[in-house]
Amino acid sequence: MITKLLTKVIGSRNDRTLRRLRKIVKEINNYEPTFEALSDEELKAKTVEFRERLEQGETLDKLLPEAFATVREASKRVYGMRHFDVQLIGGMVLNAGQIAEMRTGEGKTLTATLPAYLNALPGKGVHVVTVNDYLAKRDAETNRPLFEFLGMTVGVNVPNMPPQAKKEAYQADILYGTNNEFGFDYLRDNMAFRNEDRVQRERFFAVVDEVDSILIDEARTPLIISGPAEDSSELYTRINLLIPHLQKQDKEDSEEYRGDGHYTVDEKSKQVHLTETGQEYVEELLVKNGLMEEGDTLYSPANISLLHHVNAALRAHVLFERNVDYIVNDDGEVVIVDEHTGRTMPGRRWSEGLHQAVEAKEGVKIQNENQTLASITFQNYFRLYEKLSGMTGTADTEAFEFQSIYGLETVVIPTNKPMIRNDMPDVVYRTEAEKFAAIIEDIKERVAKGQPTLVGTVSIEKSELLSNALKKAKIKHNVLNAKFHEKEAEIVAEAGMPGAVTIATNMAGRGTDIVLGGSWQAKVESLQDPTKEQIDAIKAEWKKVHDQVLDAGGLHIIGTERHESRRIDNQLRGRSGRQGDAGSSRFYLSMEDSLLRIFTSDRMASLIQSGMEEGEAIESKMLSRSIEKAQRKVEGRNFDIRKQLLEYDDVANDQRKVVYELRDELMNVDDISDMIEQNREDVLTAIIDEYIPPQSLEDMWDVEGLQERLKADFDLDAPIKQWLEEDDKLYEEALREKIISLAVEVYKAKEEVVGAQVLRNFEKSVMLQTLDTLWKEHLAAMDHLRQGIHLRGYAQKNPKQEYKRESFELFEGLLEALKTDVITVLSRVRVQQQEEVERMEEQRRAQAEEAARRAQAQHAAAENQLADGEESEGSNQPVVRDERKVGRNEPCPCGSGKKYKQCHGQIN
């Protein structure tokens, strides 16, 4: 009560922020007459002037009013568009490293030009981050004329660019790109072996468009660069055949109850578990199919891989649905559908064998499993920026999460014109069929009035279901979902036409406004070199249609189901009522919808259904509150999952920082001999201590063992026995120094032969390669640790603490292994004379030619045999090999250095 009273008197925090910013808006507006009087050249010269003032110590905040006034004036001259005062406020919020919540149609793209220009002045680069390639290219091309007018360069960062083009793009003052590509470039840079192969420079300032989508919806998705692991496609196929034999059990097993089903499904957490009966039955099937030994159990350490395959296959069949979670494209590939945007994500694959299990289920080609080479979450990537800001139409519901995880405050920016959209209360039906019938009736009414309608669905399957119903009712419509997103811009351009009906999944043309009366720009673009008269005629025609749509009630939004997040519902509603236009929205629900089925109480469900007749709908504030409560519950749970993910990933992130800093150090110095020398001393000391314990008696020394170990691991012939015989006063400390000195001496001799520079380059290369290999193995070990850590809870231990402790031990092991492996390689490397190298190279070439000739002859013989179509007389004689058979994993005799199976073994 007191809080409400105080808010009334002094205003909310948001109101106070807006009041403060409006004072600066007045300051910017005061510059307008002066800047209007400047010539184009004088206005362009402002950029140089601002940069000079920055060098003299002026701050960006001090320059802000003039810089914003410069951009506004340039925009008027280049586009004929003047930034509204609310856009100036939005620009200031972004510059302060905060989140600006701006409604759809309020011009977020133009707003971003203000802080982008200001923060590009120091020359460190600004990244404007969008959700897809189309928006990155569109926004870059839209804003390029404005920035180039002001003397700034603009770049685009999208997938599959040549390395040099990407490097040049990163040198631009303002770079537009997708969140995925920025993250992957960071990972790729940290896998590069030469500085010139890196593309990114420092991460100074980022403006994230659709910030809720990137930092919240996708926060749980790590970016992973992976390489192929071993092939196990046959196992996926064989286990896939077992899953249809399993039966679902509705209730979990407990002490009092043991069902006869084989698995249970937890819809809330999207998990599937084998029951005890299921485990026994699966074991029986595996034994029968020769995949497991009789009497063995699925949970024995030797069968971990089998368990992994069974779980993946079970999840693929039970939890993942075609045309909802994924589609199978024309090339027979399983392509993931983003649950938040409804877009397909080509190139992305589920991990932990799930993708292969889905491929086996669909009967398409099974790709190899992958091994993680480098990984980071969006949460951790974007926290690397010195200053981070974001824009979205819907952030207020997640303001707490932005603040607690990213330290970003959300400021709600007022609309330029008051919002007059009519948001009608939800209507609930008993069944989905009744709900769809009501939606069709509503659409018919709107079409008859000439009112455009956008229907939002939660999946491709639902959008196609509704599309079929509309076809039966003979209602012309467009479908915008992951299957047709190439036509997205075209469909969105027509969605505001009188009587147009558009069905869309969550993607709902996000980032693209639905303009009432259709897009006149699209019509102009379809003409070749249009004249001014043609453009004026198109605009006049558009104005007529625009007014006609407004009279019919503007864009009507129909939601066919509530989403798990209120924010996504608000995004759908936000498509209508842009810039003060008329509009309306309504959600149609049924008791069969997943949100109502899973999250509303049984009492509420039976209460609703008991008083309802077929086709009858219920509208009630109590019900709307109950639905909102269910959504809050889901949002809370998802927030906890993301927070927990971050806490676990923070552990890996700290380790990632150490490894990448070490990599940076290695990349930026030419001489790491001091580091190598220190590592050699540490490694040899540790080994000597194993065989000659500190402060021990000579009887406890294992001299022979030490000599053998030094020879085997470091190719070091240390005559320790002889030294001890020659000097009976040689104690452990002096002996240690003598061994280390000998190792240094031997290494120096190699340096004299090959030259210091060659050896320095070799040291650096070995160190980088070893670090990358160990980091890759460490990531796999961390994955395994993470997957099983929750079981520690059963032993009354805190899983999070245990994870931190064990991952730290693993990391210490990595650092120790790095030292040992590098010193081992450097010690065992043999230096050969040039003549010897040339002789070996000649020998290798001759072997390669001989192997190629032999392979060619075999190939020709095989072709001849096929061409003849019949066996020759002696074809049934056994082939006698006149040389030793080469093993698959042995080096190829051609001398390529590859394994036989990966070289000429493939031909054979």
From Swiss-Prot:
Residues that coordinate or bind ATP: 87, 105-109, 513
Protein residues bound to Zn(2+): 892, 894, 903-904
Record GO biological process: intracellular protein transmembrane transport; protein import; protein targeting; protein transport by the Sec complex
The protein's required cofactors: Zn(2+)
SMART domains xref list: SecA_DEAD, SecA_PP_bind
One Pfam family here: SecA_DEAD
Gene3D superfamilies in the cross-refs: Helical scaffold and wing domains of SecA, P-loop containing nucleotide triphosphate hydrolases, SecA, preprotein cross-linking domain
E.C. no: 7.4.2.8
Ranges where the record places region Disordered: 834-908
CDD domains to which the protein is assigned, alphabetical: DEXDc_SecA, SF2_C_secA
Membrane topology summary: Peripheral membrane protein
Keywords assigned: ATP-binding, Cell inner membrane, Cell membrane, Cytoplasm, Membrane, Metal-binding, Nucleotide-binding, Protein transport, Translocase, Translocation, Transport, Zinc
PROSITE patterns: SECA, SECA_MOTOR_DEAD
Subcellular location, record wording: Cell inner membrane; Cytoplasm
Composition-biased stretches (Basic and acidic residues): 836-853
Cited InterPro entries: Helicase_ATP-bd, Helicase_C-like, P-loop_NTPase, SEC_C_motif, SecA, SecA_CS, SecA_DEAD, SecA_motor_DEAD
Membrane-spanning residues: none
Cofactor: record remark: May bind 1 zinc ion per subunit.
Description of how the protein assembles with itself and partners: Monomer and homodimer. Part of the essential Sec protein translocation apparatus which comprises SecA, SecYEG and auxiliary proteins SecDF-YajC and YidC.
UniProt xrefs under HAMAP family: SecA (MF_01382)
Similarity annotation: Belongs to the SecA family.
Protein's UniProt name: Protein translocase subunit SecA
Natural source organism: Vibrio parahaemolyticus serotype O3:K6 (strain RIMD 2210633)
Gene transcribed to yield this protein: secA
